[in-house]
């Protein structure tokens, strides 16, 4: 009988302990040392997802981990994806395709089927590589959930993985969390734990030695490393908790004449694919902040309505908070000279339209039709078929996504180098679509222009004639360095600032993954890790 593929698994004492990032780090370290390595997470609960080349959906974190391995994204890396669409239910995606919406008890009954799919995916993927790096979810010691576990110790046992238990020391109480987690594990689960890793440490690590002795004395498990707090990694946040924490509390306005652009992301209860903002956050002349109420809006240069897993529900939330009225009020009536540019992506794009219809009850248990924000004269009809595809598109000649008010559209002049900022041949953009529903311009409902188109001429984005409002289904539209800088420079001209005129920040995860790997390699006893895996270091 063939020996199992060596496997390392990162589990945590809590959510947001850093499992996803550390999984990516170990993937890149093993790759650097000459091993064929692949990531795996049996079940991911996330609204950040990614589409494979063959049109299948999986968690975004596994796409980043695949990049760490320099592999194409493969749905086997995350065979089960749960996308919450209410407080008690989720869309269940198995091997990249939705199998239905389920409430908690329904999914509990379905879990044996999901676990079969996860094990089969793991076995198939593991057969293709030298070593696997698995990621757990939440905590393995949730006593009310352990009986139905398919992602933590049950998966570790199937993979015969060596488990490293990760604790977030920045939040305090990490040693109690480690000991408490071990106490709540069954004996066979404790046997799978090979050691502890502390994450997000700030300070002098030598001061931790007394705690090591106490915890190791109680658990019999060694500490294999202390990973420092890593600033500005340039990698996507692993979940909405860390994303919101990162961007919360920013100043509501950029000082006039300060040279920085103020870009606002409207928070949604079921926000999805907030990684669409990652590339903008890397730009040195941009401040991105999350807002939840009209009072927080200030006077931004641009407002982005992001994707949503429950578009109609999140639209209702915007209305109840007063945000819908505030956004409409910011849509200036004088051709966009004063108001911010308003951008909708996927669900946010649907919300900006005149009407949203859900005749099949895709997002709820009954058919309904709701008025949209009315910012774009388009109508969306939800459908049971889910669009999952990668898309390449080009901007319409001369369009920069910031409107004619700044003189950046063809034939308007504008100065400040604006004409050079919007090339006649258009910008190439690439991304992916994940949505239910089809959006079409209203017949006679007001002017709307195509601003993005695919190679066959199919529209991929729409804008008002003045360019102040535009929307697209294309996730990753701002990842394109040229378009992103052109859009930002157009915003700068609207503000009366000089355009930068060149790409200053490239959105490239590979150097960031190398920096991450270097930091973790220097903080963790890799000789011990290799001995656990039964592998010699290579380099």
From Swiss-Prot:
The active site is at 346 (nucleophile), 475. One of its GO terms (molecular function) is catalytic activity. Coiled coil: none annotated. Gene3D superfamilies: 3.40.50.880, P-loop containing nucleotide triphosphate hydrolases. Pathway: Cofactor biosynthesis; adenosylcobalamin biosynthesis. It comes from the Bacteria. One of its GO terms (biological process) is cobalamin biosynthetic process. Residues 260-483 form the GATase cobBQ-type domain. CDD domains: CobQ_N (cd05389), GATase1_CobQ (cd01750). Keywords: Cobalamin biosynthesis, Glutamine amidotransferase. Catalyzes amidations at positions B, D, E, and G on adenosylcobyrinic A,C-diamide. NH(2) groups are provided by glutamine, and one molecule of ATP is hydrogenolyzed for each amidation. Belongs to the CobB/CobQ family. CobQ subfamily. This is Cobyric acid synthase.
């Amino acid at each position: 009988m063939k020996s199992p593929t060596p496997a390392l698994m990162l589990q945590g004492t809590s959510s947001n302990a850093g499992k996803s990032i550390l999984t990516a780090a170990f993937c890149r370290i093993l790759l650097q040392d000459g091993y064929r390595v692949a990531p795996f997470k049996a079940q991911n609960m996330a609204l950040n997802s990614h589409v494979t080349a063959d049109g299948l959906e999986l968690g975004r974190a596994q796409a980043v981990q695949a990049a760490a391995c320099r592999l194409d994204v493969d749905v086997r890396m995350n065979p089960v994806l749960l996308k919450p669409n209410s407080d008690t239910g989720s869309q269940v995606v198995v091997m990249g395709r939705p199998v239905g919406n389920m409430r908690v008890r329904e999914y509990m009954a379905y879990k044996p089927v999901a676990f079969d799919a996860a094990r089969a995916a793991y076995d198939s993927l593991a057969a293709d590589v030298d070593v696997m790096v698995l990621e757990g979810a939440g905590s393995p010691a949730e006593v009310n959930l352990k009986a139905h576990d398919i992602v933590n110790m049950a998966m570790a046992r199937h993979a015969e993985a060596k488990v490293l238990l990760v604790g977030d020391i920045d939040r305090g109480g990490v040693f109690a969390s480690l000991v408490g987690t071990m106490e709540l594990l069954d004996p066979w689960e404790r046997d799978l734990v090979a050691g502890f890793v502390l994450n997000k440490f700030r300070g002098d690590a030598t001061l931790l030695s007394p705690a090591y002795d106490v915890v190791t004395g109680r658990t019999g498990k060694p500490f294999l490393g202390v990973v420092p707090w890593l600033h500005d990694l340039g990698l996507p946040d692993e979940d909405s908790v860390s994303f919101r924490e990162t961007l919360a509390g920013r100043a509501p306005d950029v000082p006039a004449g300060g040279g920085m652009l103020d870009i606002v992301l409207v928070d949604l209860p079921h926000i999805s694919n907030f990684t669409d903002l990652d590339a903008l956050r890397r730009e040195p002349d941009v401040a991105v902040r999350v807002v939840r109420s009209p009072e927080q809006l200030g006077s931004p240069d641009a407002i982005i309505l992001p994707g949503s897993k429950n578009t109609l529900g999140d639209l209702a939330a915007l209305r109840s908070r007063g945000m819908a009225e505030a956004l409409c009020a910011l849509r200036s009536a004088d051709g966009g000279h004063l108001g911010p540019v308003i951008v909708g992506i996927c669900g946010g794009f649907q919300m900006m339209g005149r009407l949203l219809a859900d005749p099949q009850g895709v997002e709820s248990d009954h058919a309904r039709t709701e008025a949209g924000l009315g910012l774009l004269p388009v109508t969306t009809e939800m459908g049971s078929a889910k669009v999952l595809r990668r898309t390449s598109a080009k901007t319409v000649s001369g369009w920069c996504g910031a409107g004619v008010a700044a003189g950046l559209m063809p034939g308007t002049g504008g100065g400040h180098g604006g004409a050079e900022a919007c090339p006649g041949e258009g910008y190439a953009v690439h991304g992916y679509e994940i949505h239910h529903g089809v959006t079409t311009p209203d017949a006679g409902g007001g002017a709307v222009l195509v601003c993005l188109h695919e190679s066959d001429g199919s529209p991929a984005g729409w804008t008002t004639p003045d360019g102040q409002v535009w929307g697209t289904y294309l996730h990753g539209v701002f990842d394109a360095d040229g378009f992103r800088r052109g859009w930002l420079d157009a915003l700068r001209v609207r503000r009366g600032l000089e355009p930068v005129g060149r790409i200053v920040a490239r959105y490239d995860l590979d150097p960031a993954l190398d920096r991450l790997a270097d930091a973790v390699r220097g903080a963790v006893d890799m000789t011990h890790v290799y001995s656990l895996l039964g592998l010699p270091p290579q380099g």
